[in-house]
Amino acid sequence: MAARVCLVHYHEVGLKGKNRAHFEHILMDNIKAALAAFSVNAVSRISGYILVTFNEHQADEAARVIRTVPGVARVSLAYHTNRDPQEYCAAAVKALREFGPFDSFKVHAKRSNTDYELTSIDINRQVGEVLCEAFPDKKVQMHDPDAMVHVLVVQGSVYVYARSERGVGGLPVGSAGKVVTLLSSGIDSPVATWMLARRGAVCVPVHFSGRPQTPDTSEYLVQDIIRALAPGVQIGRLYVVPFGDCQREISVTCPSNLRVIMYRRIMYSVAERIAHIEGAKAIVTGESLGQVASQTLENIMAVNEAVKIPVFRPLIGSDKQEIIARAEEIGTFDISTEAAPDCCTLFMPRRPETHAKLDAVHEAWELFDHEEMIERLLKQTEYIDFESNTYKAPKTLKRKHPQLASREIYQDHE
């Protein structure tokens, strides 16, 4: 009897040269981690594909999870048979029947080696005849058919499929280093975090809470966002910085029109310190050019110069509708639209500066002890750990930075 399996296709990983095996192993580990809730028998490499086999009938449900793992270009629900033509022809009938509505079809056979006596053309003809008998009202169409039945002869086995779903693509998480992301409970920053994860980066979010000036609702929502990104994108640690009191100090010390810029310079500076602790090489934000007052070119430059580490803005050229569409796709939109007071809405000026002058920014920056504030916030920072196979905590964290406090993961909340 043909076994149901998942064939995982990859694109960018396959373009790698001598490092290809390294990327494949990372992707395989990430697929295993994403399928922790499933009864997986094995995850293995076979001639340009990753094969996932199961102890139970779970392939259909597992395919929906696999396609969310960065690095996966496509997932095909396949039947695994031996080289007996009767078996793989019967599997082809099953595969085409499960495809859904169609009027035309084509068979595409491929051999990874030539030790099988039948050629690809022979297999095409053989399987095509059986399908024509099974579906007499359907027509064979060589160009642009509704359904394509693939027959792959690989390493002594045959894999047959017609259904194939697009994955998120990109590179496997853990193949491109570590970044710190400024993660709020809003719409933009979760999308920016996901986009960097899709390029292979291990993301370490830092959330600036309005606590104690506001409730900690946003902290719960950020944790929900992290869970929503899983299991495809697994985040191992969330840093929470209670920023409310410092915002209040800035609001009474600095010119009102420059408050937001001062807030963000402090946030970037704290994130940079955490990046050094974590061994991260960049900061990631959800800024989109011109979307709000703080995201004009002048204001971005005024904030950016507070840190030396690179700042990535993957959404900089996206409009709001594009960002919303992506948030809906990755499952964070509904969480991000829940009302929650946070540091982004706390002590906001009526007329924020939209074209900040650096001289004025530097003067405002010297009106308060920013170094002391950064150190104070770092001492008040807490972190929450989540299940992740890609995140590696800094080994010297507790010895060199005992001020950082671990906090238990919040469970269910109202």
Predicted regions and their residues:
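RNA-binding accessory domains that recognize and position tRNA/RNA substrates
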Residues: 1-180, 190-237, 305, 353-358, ...
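Active-site lining segments that contact anionic ligands and/or coordinate catalytic metals
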Residues: 5, 235, 280, 341-343, ...
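A glycine-rich phosphate-binding loop feature that marks nucleotide/adenosyl-phosphate handling sites
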Residues: 48, 241-245, 288, 340-349
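Active-site adenylate/phosphate-handling loop in enzymes that bind or generate adenylated species
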Residues: 126-131, 164, 169-176, 247-248, ...
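Structural beta-sheet core signal
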Residues: 181, 205-207, 240, 285, ...
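Conserved G/P- and acidic residue-centered "switch" motifs that form tight phosphate/ATP-binding loops
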Residues: 186
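A conserved beta-strand->alpha-helix junction
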Residues: 226-253, 340-342
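Short hairpin/turn module used for nucleic-acid contact or packing/dimerization
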Residues: 292, 298-414
